[in-house]
């Protein structure tokens, strides 16, 4: 019998995950569906909880809404589906908490302990198909500036280190983890970092002119999967 699957959050990663679960039900906060309110009354076997407020500068400005969706939305989901196998989207931002978003993802990791069959998975700078060029993610931002020939600005001197993860690899491993009996918290990344300036050269083919802005309070200098 085919397992009943729910995917919350059908943005960049959720859209790629749907390729592996074409018959899954979906729930997306962008469509006005509130995960803090009543959730679908169905006995799901497997749930991927990806829905979240994630743009870090916006989360800083709208902290209450970020906490409501990311924290209380997760608690609501865990309480609503006590018998499902659940994977929660965590983040490398909780490794060194410097933002409201990172704080909420640390909460998500700890909340996984409230459920008998739950795994929180920490993502590391995911890139790939269906990712919007606009927004705060590093890879699409660089590609957008290169294609539009617009001035590139970064925070800091470009010596930040990042572990970038291809979304195709990420979703395949999410499926494997869903079928496993692993619980608690785990990491999905390559464990191999690249310096931002070198990454810029890789995408552009050379080092373009860059405007270096001051480091922000929420900027993390090194993000690497163990």
Question: What positions do the PLM features span?
Answer:
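Rossmann-fold scaffold of SDR-type NAD(P)-dependent oxidoreductases
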Residues: 8, 45-50, 88, 187
């Amino acid at each position: 019998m085919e397992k009943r699957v729910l995917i919350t959050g059908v943005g960049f990663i959720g859209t790629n995950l749907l390729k592996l679960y074409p018959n899954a039900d979906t729930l997306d906060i962008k469509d006005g569906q509130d995960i803090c309110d009543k959730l679908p009354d169905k006995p799901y076997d497997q749930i991927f909880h990806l829905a979240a407020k994630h743009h870090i500068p916006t989360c800083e400005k709208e902290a209450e809404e970020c906490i409501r969706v990311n924290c209380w939305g997760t608690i609501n989901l865990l309480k609503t589906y006590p018998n499902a196998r659940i994977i929660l989207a965590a983040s490398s931002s909780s490794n060194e908490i410097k933002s409201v978003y990172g704080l909420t993802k640390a909460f998500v990791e700890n909340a996984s302990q409230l459920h008998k069959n739950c795994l929180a998975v920490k993502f590391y700078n995911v890139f790939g198909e269906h990712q919007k060029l606009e927004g705060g993610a590093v890879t699409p931002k660089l590609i957008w500036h290169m294609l539009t020939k617009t001035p590139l600005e970064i925070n800091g001197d470009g010596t930040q280190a990042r572990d970038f993860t291809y979304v195709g690899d990420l979703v395949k491993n999410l499926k494997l983890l869903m079928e496993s009996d692993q619980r608690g918290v785990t990491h999905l990344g390559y464990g191999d970092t690249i310096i931002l300036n070198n990454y810029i050269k890789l995408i552009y083919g050379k080092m373009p002119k860059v405007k270096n802005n001051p480091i922000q309070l929420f900027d993390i200098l090194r993000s690497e999967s163990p």
